[in-house]
Amino acid sequence: MTLWINGDWVTGQGALRVKRNPVSGEVLWQGNDADAAQVGQACRAARAAFPRWARLSFGDRQVRVECFAGLLESNKAELTAIIARETGKPRWESATEVTAMINKIAISIKAYHVRTGEQRSEMPDGAASLRHRPHGVLAVFGPYNFPGHLPNGHIVPALLAGNTIIFKPSELTPWSGEAVMRLWQQAGLPPGVLNLVQGGRETGQALSALEDLDGLLFTGSANTGYQLHRQLSGQPEKILALEMGGNNPLIIDEVADIDAAVHLTIQSAFVTAGQRCTCARRLFLKSGTQGDAFLARLVAVSQRLTPGTWDDEPQPFIGGLISEQAAQQVVTAWQELEAMGGRTLLAPRLLQAGTSLLTPGIIEMTGVTGVPDEEVFGPLLRVWRYDNFDEAIRMANNTRFGLSCGLVSPEREKFDQLLLEARAGIVNWNKPLTGAASTAPFGGIGASGNHRPSAWYAADYCAWPMASLESDSLTLPATLNPGLDFSDEVVR
């Protein structure tokens, strides 16, 4: 039984799904998808649970959420292993994900009060008040790269605000989704407040098509995000928050410490085997001997990055991709770029057939036209050389996406120019593109999102504002508007 609906574990009535470790092929989890009828049951359960959950005080909801944080802490080792085995990530990185989940609780509580709390302004004849109210029933679609942390970034603020939820994990990480749901169960959420439905496209389409849904919170690919946007078009009453990845540029200008710049670039492009939505996909490198030296060093160090299994000792920097198919898609993308005229500096290699262990790839595309503006979700970095900083910014902005952008330079003036001209929601200076703070908004523009950033701003899309003018008594104004006569004289 792998679905959690209205406080009960039930067996899915859809197709059988089997999840294997992407490197070893070991069977980790199996269960049946939720069919459309079960998705409807989950929605009805969430709708029935909503009034009572929303009427609880914020403090009562906070107690349940903080209990979940405590359970994350006490089950950290077990959840770390589940995420690592299911995604192929190294143990160290999965541990940082669980830590981020724990930290998200306190941050979300603070963000609720700052972004969507209550305010009151006294007026001569009363007061003006601002409150926030939950939407109702929200669907949360989780991604596979951070199957605990990223859904958590929607679920926690949504529950704190008083919403009830139907959570569909990625079909590639059902085990992690179930493990997190079992911790929420132990936290004592009332039946129907949080429901889990497993499945792929059919389950997702059934969920997003529900009429009795007040909103949908999504993290994933641009293609799926666009499909959801089209599906919910003409329904302005439903909140839709989309985070859809990017084709992110990193500009390497002047470099004082080549190794430090190489380290930043590797952290930006290859951490999580390139499976972060903020990863650098395009590297813009200043022409000249310094740029040549940097590029040679980048290739040399990247060549030493050998992916390993989740429990390898010593621990590897990167593990496997989410699947062999995902790894092969990166290799295919590299081959297509090479066929267009790209110059391979480091070829990505599948270490062993039947696994997802893929070494990083670097290919120079300077002078090549018609390069697709697509996100290659893996460890493949494309390089362009530029002559002046204005050209670098133009090239960086030449994308339909707009999630992250970064600059390596000692010159504050150039960063200030980038801040003015960059088309991205995250713009970093001498910091990896993959570095983000939960105390700041996280999201992009263009094909990277629909202006509903998460993290610190997640509270904004989890509640709507209610403004009130209030007075505890009603009296006739001392001064009336022209044309109003409340005298006792009878007009004849």
Curated annotation (Swiss-Prot):
Pfam families named in the record: Aldedh
Keywords: Arginine metabolism, NAD, Oxidoreductase
Recorded GO MF terms: aldehyde dehydrogenase [NAD(P)+] activity; succinylglutamate-semialdehyde dehydrogenase activity
Sites where the protein binds NAD(+): 220-225
Stretch forming the signal peptide: none
GO biological process, any: arginine catabolic process to succinate
Domain of life: Bacteria
Known pathway: Amino-acid degradation; L-arginine degradation via AST pathway; L-glutamate and succinate from L-arginine: step 4/5
Entries under InterPro entries matching the protein: Ald_DH/histidinol_DH, Ald_DH_C, Ald_DH_CS_CYS, Ald_DH_CS_GLU, Ald_DH_N, Aldehyde_DH_dom, SuccinylGlu_semiald_DH_AstD
Enzyme class: oxidoreductase
Enzyme Commission number, as recorded: 1.2.1.71
Catalytic reaction(s) noted: N-succinyl-L-glutamate 5-semialdehyde + NAD(+) + H2O = N-succinyl-L-glutamate + NADH + 2 H(+)
Active site: 243, 277
Family listed: Belongs to the aldehyde dehydrogenase family. AstD subfamily.
Function: Catalyzes the NAD-dependent reduction of succinylglutamate semialdehyde into succinylglutamate.
Name of protein: N-succinylglutamate 5-semialdehyde dehydrogenase
Organism: Escherichia coli O127:H6 (strain E2348/69 / EPEC)
Lineage: Bacteria, Pseudomonadati, Pseudomonadota, Gammaproteobacteria, Enterobacterales
